[in-house]
From Swiss-Prot:
This is tRNA sulfurtransferase. One of its GO terms (molecular function) is tRNA binding. HAMAP family: ThiI. Pathway: Cofactor biosynthesis; thiamine diphosphate biosynthesis. Its EC number is 2.8.1.4. Catalyzes the ATP-dependent transfer of a sulfur to tRNA to produce 4-thiouridine in position 8 of tRNAs, which functions as a near-UV photosensor. Also catalyzes the transfer of sulfur to the sulfur carrier protein ThiS, forming ThiS-thiocarboxylate. This is a step in the synthesis of thiazole, in the thiamine biosynthesis pathway. The sulfur is donated as persulfide by IscS. Residues 405-483 form the Rhodanese domain. GO terms for cellular component: cytosol. It comes from Pseudomonas aeruginosa (strain ATCC 15692 / DSM 22644 / CIP 104116 / JCM 14847 / LMG 12228 / 1C / PRS 101 / PAO1). ATP binds at residues 185-186, 267, 289, 298. PROSITE patterns: RHODANESE_3, THUMP. Residues 63-167 form the THUMP domain. It catalyses: [ThiI sulfur-carrier protein]-S-sulfanyl-L-cysteine + a uridine in tRNA + 2 reduced [2Fe-2S]-[ferredoxin] + ATP + H(+) = [ThiI sulfur-carrier protein]-L-cysteine + a 4-thiouridine in tRNA + 2 oxidized [2Fe-2S]-[ferredoxin] + AMP + diphosphate; [ThiS sulfur-carrier protein]-C-terminal Gly-Gly-AMP + S-sulfanyl-L-cysteinyl-[cysteine desulfurase] + AH2 = [ThiS sulfur-carrier protein]-C-terminal-Gly-aminoethanethioate + L-cysteinyl-[cysteine desulfurase] + A + AMP + 2 H(+).
Length: 484
């Protein structure tokens, strides 16, 4: 199988040195993406295209090659072709008839020819000769240049003829590795996954940082979607996944910061931490999935206040996107199902968030915050290459859910204190303890290890995530309480 890869159009208008550098990078990426399918793959470059040749004959492997190339940044489109030495017009006609003759009976068709190099004929002369010959010899209904039922396409390059069988769309953008690198703040929801995709599609190597607010299970869920994005759109490059434990940071905010400023303060803490990670990794910008006024922390005044904590460039590729458009894109790229089951935590910590944050006020609220907590979170951050995070998913533990409380078991209400106060959990004959989600991981070890504990929250999401984390920490006496 031979493929002709056409580069993204914006590459073709670059200066000669830049264009050559981008083409070389794209060739390198294609080899990396397809290496496991064909170690002997040949990729050779020309000024405006690359020729990819494989001896692999397995149909499944070929389909996988096509799929991977459609998801490789830097490719405008690519063609499946058969290559022949260039002969005379009769030879060209014979080759086209051999490939398309059985498709033309009773159909309208058009012949399209592109040329590169010096020849004694024009592209139009080739089209006319081949078109009239095919119409005469193949029983075609006629020639229709505007809306043909069949297109007979070919390219002539110097002394070679390429008969084109199929054209596949590319992802566009620039080759990964040709531009700068960024750090994506990844929550695993619709917005952050689509924002990451947009940056990767444009051609920027995108590393991931995750601020863990919800326990081990949430972390694993984000690892899973990060691995998916890397494998599908960025596998040609080495990408890092950094996880920062932020439960203690959230606890500090909840206990010391005014309710209306909790969300803005949390985002500022995330940007502070992300900037430190980006600086350490020598990355050029931060990327978030924020869109104007989608939630309270994303108003222009709030975004302005949030950005003041960092000198690092903050990119927001979705800033003017509608939520439905973001969801549609997530479905298109395959992250929607991940996001649909991935809870967003930023909204659970503030009841009456401000939409008009004032710099002096947020600075006053942050003066109550013990910055040593943020430093500890950064010190405890873990880093691994994203291709290895999937290994950790295999070490996952299942969480048992129960609908009834047995004698001797204790139910722990992990909801936010406001929810506990508004709707107290009262179960007849059952001991209920209140231990908010942001404290459960640090304080669970203080509980009697000989008792059985059932974690409870309204929807079962937070309880499941924290039970999962505790199980992975070695606590076998924890389940999830999900009343019928």
């Amino acid at each position: 199988m031979k493929l002709i890869v056409k580069t993204f159009q914006e590459i073709t208008i670059k200066s000669r040195p830049v264009r050559k550098r981008f083409i070389r990078q794209l060739a390198k990426n294609i080899r990396a993406v397809l290496r496991d399918l064909d170690p002997e793959l040949k990729v050779e470059g020309e000024w405006d295209n690359l020729e990819v040749e494989t001896a692999v004959v397995d149909a499944k492997a070929r389909r996988e090659m096509i799929e991977r190339l459609t998801c490789t940044p830097g490719i405008g489109h690519f063609l499946e072709v058969h290559e022949y030495p260039l002969g005379d017009f009769d030879d060209i006609l014979a080759k086209c008839k051999a490939h398309f003759g059985d498709q033309l009976a009773g159909k309208t068709f058009a012949v399209r020819c592109k040329r590169a190099g010096k020849h004694a004929f024009t592209s139009m002369e080739v089209e006319r000769y081949v078109g009239s010959g095919l119409r005469r010899e193949c029983g075609a209904a006629g020639i229709d240049l505007k809306q043909p039922e069949v297109e007979v396409r070919m390219e002539i390059r110097l002394d070679r003829l390429f008969v084109i069988h199929r054209q596949h769309p590319g992802l566009g953008g620039y080759p990964l590795g040709a531009l700068e690198q960024v750090l994506v703040l990844m929550s695993g929801g619709f917005d952050s996954t689509v924002a990451a995709y947009q940056m990767m599609r444009r051609g920027m190597i995108s590393h991931f940082v995750f601020f863990n607010l919800g326990g081990r299970a949430h972390e694993l869920g984000v690892m899973e979607v990060a691995h998916y994005l890397w494998e599908k759109y960025g596998r040609s490059q080495r990408v890092l996944f950094v996880s920062v434990p932020f439960e203690e940071v959230v606890g500090e905010i909840l206990t010391k910061v005014d309710d209306s400023y909790m969300g803005v303060t949390l985002k500022r803490m995330m940007l502070r931490a992300a900037s430190r990670v980006a600086e350490r990794l020598e990355l050029d910008a931060l990327v978030t999935g924020e869109a104007i006024s989608q939630v309270s922390s994303q108003t222009l005044p709030n975004l302005s206040v949030i950005d003041r904590v960092t000198d690092t460039l903050v990119l927001r590729p979705l800033i003017v996107s509608h939520k439905q458009d973001i969801i549609d894109t997530a479905r298109q790229i395959g992250t929607a199902e991940f996001a649909r089951h991935m809870p967003e935590y930023c909204g659970v910590i503030s009841v009456n968030p401000t939409t008009q944050a004032k710099p002096y006020r947020v600075e006053h609220e942050e003066s109550k915050f013990d910055m040593a907590v943020l430093e500890r979170a950064l010190e405890r951050a873990t880093q691994r290459t994203v291709d290895r995070v999937i290994d950790e998913l295999g070490q996952d533990l299942q969480v048992e859910e129960v609908g009834e409380v047995l004698p001797g078991q204790i139910v722990i209400d992990i909801r936010h204190p406001d929810a506990q106060e508004d709707e107290p959990l009262a179960l007849e004959g059952v001991e209920v303890q209140a231990l908010p989600f942001y404290a459960i991981n640090s304080r669970f070890k203080e509980l009697d290890a000989n008792r059985q504990y059932l974690l409870y929250c309204d929807k079962g999401v937070m309880s499941r995530l924290h039970a999962h984390h505790l199980l992975n920490e070695g606590h076998t006496n924890v389940r999830v309480y999900r009343p019928a």
